[in-house]
């Protein structure tokens, strides 16, 4: 394995690896199939600028070196982290893989992170704000990093996740970075249920977003609920759109004007009668 890494390490960053990986893992499942390995190595060597005359020979060498220590699962799937280790330094590897190790399953937690790092409430994460996020991320994982490297990795993350190349990240970009799981509300069919079923579903929904268990949604709990509600009808939303809809929801639902949405207030908004 070391011999496979020597000529490539330092020649490729996480963004370069990601460009090749995406050709094969379009749906971002985190793995490719064993039958795709030859083509993957071929594209990777092309990215590294290896001469065509020796490319095919090197593909077979790399495949042998990779397969020797790896026990490919019975379903023939090869995880991204197994291949990334061949080409990337430890830190570059971390940038690519931390999102797979700790995916977020809560829009409430996601919005807490969004509000923290969108420090100027612009509705976007700037490069400087992303840099702060990465600094905290490395500290959390007890990894020492210089400011110069931090700036370099911020640029790498922008290359990977800034889809429209405008130099800033929107809600959807950060959701991809944090590997936010499927919208919690997708499992409910509110319009196709009886009154009792709707009440039962409402209880589950409110309990999910009332993370603090106070009987009211506030702060990122409101944000998380708004985000998931909006994405039921508009899959790609911006931070500024979320803020507008949040204001509308509070205007309609926050009857006592305390800046929170009580359980009874949300039920009333949704046309439900619940037991006090």
Curated annotation (Swiss-Prot):
Entry GO CC: cytosol; dendrite; extracellular region; nucleus; synapse; terminal bouton; transport vesicle membrane
PROSITE patterns: EF_HAND_1, EF_HAND_2
Gene name tied to this protein: SCGN
Binding site for Ca(2+) 1: 71, 73, 75, 77, 82
Domain of life of the source: Eukaryota
GO molecular function: calcium ion binding
Originating species: Bos taurus (Bovine)
The protein's name in its UniProt record: Secretagogin
Binding site for Ca(2+) 4: 210, 212, 214, 221
Binding site for Ca(2+) 2: 118, 120, 122, 129
Compartment(s) of residence: Cytoplasm; Secreted; Cytoplasmic vesicle, Secretory vesicle membrane
């Amino acid at each position: 394995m070391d011999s496979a890494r020597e000529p490539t390490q330092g020649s490729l960053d996480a963004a370069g690896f990601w460009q090749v990986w995406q050709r094969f893992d379009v749906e971002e499942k985190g793995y490719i199939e064993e039958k795709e390995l030859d083509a993957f190595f071929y594209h990777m060597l092309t990215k590294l600028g290896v001469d065509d005359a020796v490319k095919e020979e090197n593909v077979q060498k790399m495949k042998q070196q990779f397969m020797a220590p790896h026990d490919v699962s019975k379903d023939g799937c090869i995880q991204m982290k197994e291949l990334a280790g061949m080409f990337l330094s430890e830190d570059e590897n971390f940038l690519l893989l931390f999102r797979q190790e700790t995916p977020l399953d809560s829009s409430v937690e996601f919005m807490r992170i969004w509000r923290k790092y969108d420090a100027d409430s612009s509705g976007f994460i700037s490069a400087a704000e992303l840099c702060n996020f990465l600094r905290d991320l490395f500290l959390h994982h007890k990894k020492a990093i210089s400011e110069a490297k931090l700036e370099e990795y911020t640029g790498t993350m922008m290359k990977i996740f800034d889809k429209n190349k405008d130099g800033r990240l929107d809600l959807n970009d950060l959701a991809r970075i944090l590997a936010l799981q499927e919208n919690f509300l997708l499992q409910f069919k509110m319009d196709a249920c009886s009154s009792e079923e709707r009440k039962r579903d409402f209880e589950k929904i409110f309990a999910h977003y009332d993370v603090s268990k106070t009987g009211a949604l506030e702060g990122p709990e409101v944000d998380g609920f708004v985000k998931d509600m909006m994405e039921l009808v508009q899959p790609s939303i911006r931070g500024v759109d979320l803020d507008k809809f949040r204001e509308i929801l509070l205007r309609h639902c926050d009857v006592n004007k305390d800046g929170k949405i009580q359980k009874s207030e949300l039920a009333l908004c949704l046309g439900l009668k619940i037991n006090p």
